[in-house]
């Protein structure tokens, strides 16, 4: 599945390079119109991130994002600044099909477990951003500044055992770079657990990348910068996955 992604900062569509806020690049597109364009192009799902809320939950842009998603006729998943049960509830009530949980899923596992038990595992995407280390893939949190005490596969097992099947994994070194995805990361994940649906994110720059990810058995391919920069269209990406 092709999943177009939009990151929002200061109520505008942006991209970051390797997650660093000082590298922000603003795009002159209106959020609601861009989402509609992606949906009309045949995307089966959309991905939204509130970068303001991710950095500072007191500055959430949820009103702006919810106004833009109101008329959407395709499912969407949303992340950024989701810190408590009420946040999960608010997004699901606003029409999100799934909430994307990142740092909290690494640092507050028992709390996230309680949310999953309350709202249902099908409403969650666990987002694990990793660095390659000598011992394997190490998840990092808080804008990728803090390394986790748990390994990637350990966290996947924890949430898979709770019934979660959607995992969004990003190799931090690839994010926003358009230098090709981290095929090794996705191979390791699929080899470890073939029942989960892995969403690949970061580095996708060509239709060939998409083709290779599909051949690996990836469940979803998140496309941000490549679509915004016009490397290819949603329709072209979909054609490669058919």
Curated annotation (Swiss-Prot):
Pfam families: His_biosynth (PF00977). The active site is at 7 (proton acceptor), 129 (proton donor). InterPro entries: Aldolase_TIM (IPR013785), His_biosynth (IPR006062), Isoase_HisA-like (IPR044524), Isoase_HisA-like_bact (IPR023016), RibuloseP-bd_barrel (IPR011060). One of its GO terms (molecular function) is 1-(5-phosphoribosyl)-5-[(5-phosphoribosylamino)methylideneamino]imidazole-4-carboxamide isomerase activity. It is an enzyme of class 5 (isomerase). Its main location: cytoplasm. GO terms for biological process: L-histidine biosynthetic process; L-tryptophan biosynthetic process. It catalyses: 1-(5-phospho-beta-D-ribosyl)-5-[(5-phospho-beta-D-ribosylamino)methylideneamino]imidazole-4-carboxamide = 5-[(5-phospho-1-deoxy-D-ribulos-1-ylimino)methylamino]-1-(5-phospho-beta-D-ribosyl)imidazole-4-carboxamide. Pathway: Amino-acid biosynthesis; L-histidine biosynthesis; L-histidine from 5-phospho-alpha-D-ribose 1-diphosphate: step 4/9. It is found in: Cytoplasm. One of its GO terms (cellular component) is cytoplasm. Keywords: Amino-acid biosynthesis, Cytoplasm, Histidine biosynthesis, Isomerase. Its EC number is 5.3.1.16. Belongs to the HisA/HisF family. This is 1-(5-phosphoribosyl)-5-[(5-phosphoribosylamino)methylideneamino] imidazole-4-carboxamide isomerase. It comes from Pseudoalteromonas translucida (strain TAC 125). The lineage of its organism: Bacteria, Pseudomonadati, Pseudomonadota, Gammaproteobacteria, Alteromonadales.
């Amino acid at each position: 599945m092709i999943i177009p992604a939009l990151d929002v900062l200061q109520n505008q569509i942006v991209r970051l390079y390797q997650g660093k806020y000082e590298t922000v690049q603003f795009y002159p597109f209106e959020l609601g119109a861009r989402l509609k364009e992606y949906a009309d192009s045949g995307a089966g799902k959309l991905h939204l991130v509130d970068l303001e809320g991710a950095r500072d939950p007191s500055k959430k842009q949820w009103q702006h994002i919810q106004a833009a998603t109101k008329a959407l006729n395709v499912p969407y998943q949303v992340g950024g600044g989701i810190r408590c049960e009420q946040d999960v509830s608010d997004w699901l009530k606003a029409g999100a099909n799934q909430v994307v949980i990142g740092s909290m899923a690494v640092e507050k596992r028992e709390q996230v477990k309680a949310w999953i038990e309350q709202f249902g595992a099908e409403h969650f995407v666990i987002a694990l951003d990793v660095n390659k280390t000598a011992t394997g893939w190490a998840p990092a949190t808080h804008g990728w500044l803090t390394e986790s005490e748990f390994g990637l596969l350990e966290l996947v097992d924890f949430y898979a055992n709770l019934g979660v099947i959607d995992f969004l994994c990003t190799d931090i070194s690839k994010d926003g770079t358009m230098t090709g995805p981290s095929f090794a990361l996705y191979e390791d994940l699929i080899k470890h657990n073939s029942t989960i649906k892995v969403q690949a994110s970061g580095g996708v720059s060509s239709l060939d990348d998409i083709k290779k990810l599909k051949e690996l058995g990836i469940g979803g391919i998140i496309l941000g910068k490549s679509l915004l920069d016009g490397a290819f269209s949603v329709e072209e990406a979909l054609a490669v996955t058919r």
